[in-house]
Amino acid sequence: MRIVFMGTPDFAAASLKKLIDEKYDIAAVFTQPDKPRNRGMQMSFSPVKQLAVDNDIPVYQPTKLRDGSASEIIRSLNPDILVVVAYGRILPDDMLSIAKYGAINVHASLLPKYRGAAPIQWAVLNGDKVTGVSTMYLASEMDTGDVIYTAETEIGEFETSGELFDRLMVMGAELLHKTLTDIEAGTAPRTPQNHADASYITMLDKSLSPIDWSKTPREIVKWVYGLQPWPVATMQLGSDTFKVYAAAYTETETDKAPGSIVSAGKNGIEIACAGGQTVLITELQAPGKKRMKAADYLLGHPIKVED
């Protein structure tokens, strides 16, 4: 099967590597233009481009998709199918029908849930117990195409979005291989999505970082782990903003207002939240300091807890 692969970040690179390892005919790779990625403003390749270059696969990095030139390139490559994984661009309608088998996508949610960007993080942030990956045919509107296969996995109670990302990245690559095998064999299913059940999510940004102590302990814990590795949850101690990397449940009950410190000691910093409950902050990072256990921070910076 001759493939044109379109993708950009690590999540996509895992799928491309799987296709390379399985000896698919990769006619070319399309990826986002090179961007400056450090303080020196040096241009660097996307993970997908680097993998393609390392394997002598032709790379295209169009700045526009709707002027027809990218579509002409794809037609000249005569692919059997377009495979799109976290490319970062919406394909124009004419591009979807160029290849014999159309265009398929790997999406990191159980569609139609979590259409859009950052589905992995929002599954953790929302406290979901199960998530997964889907393969689907691309359609005109984002993430609305017919589903081919899904694969589910449980989310660990204290699993970060980064850890879940790594697992779903591998699952997505495996599911893509199965999908392509069955499409070529003519046995792949095609199930329309129930659009009434669809939900849409947005990109993350730093405005989400401050912890809302009026939430329940579980909501706060999931917020802490869902915002890792970026943008990371934050809390205020005095006038300083601390990054929060780990939190735990407690059995403490309190009549203090949400956000009040209930205790601070060898276990960490216990803070009041919704319903007279508390949550324990066990790992944090002070401004300009390294990440550390909250208990270790308190050894040099004790907190006086008011009654």
Residue ranges: model-predicted function:
Residues 8-11, 63-66, 87-90, 227:
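Short beta->alpha connector loops
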Residues 214-307:
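An anion-binding loop in the catalytic cleft
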Residues 202-214:
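Acyl-group handling in specialized metabolite and lipid biosynthesis
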Residues 7, 29, 52, 82, ...:
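A residue-level signal for conserved active-site and pocket-lining positions in enzyme catalytic cores
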Residues 22, 32, 81-200:
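Donor/substrate-binding cores of folate-linked one-carbon enzymes
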Residues 25, 56-58, 102:
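Conserved beta-strand segments of alpha/beta enzyme cores
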Residues 36-78:
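N-terminal glycine-/serine-/threonine-rich beta1-alpha1-beta2 phosphate-ribose binding loop
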Residues 1-40:
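N-terminal Rossmann-like dinucleotide-binding module
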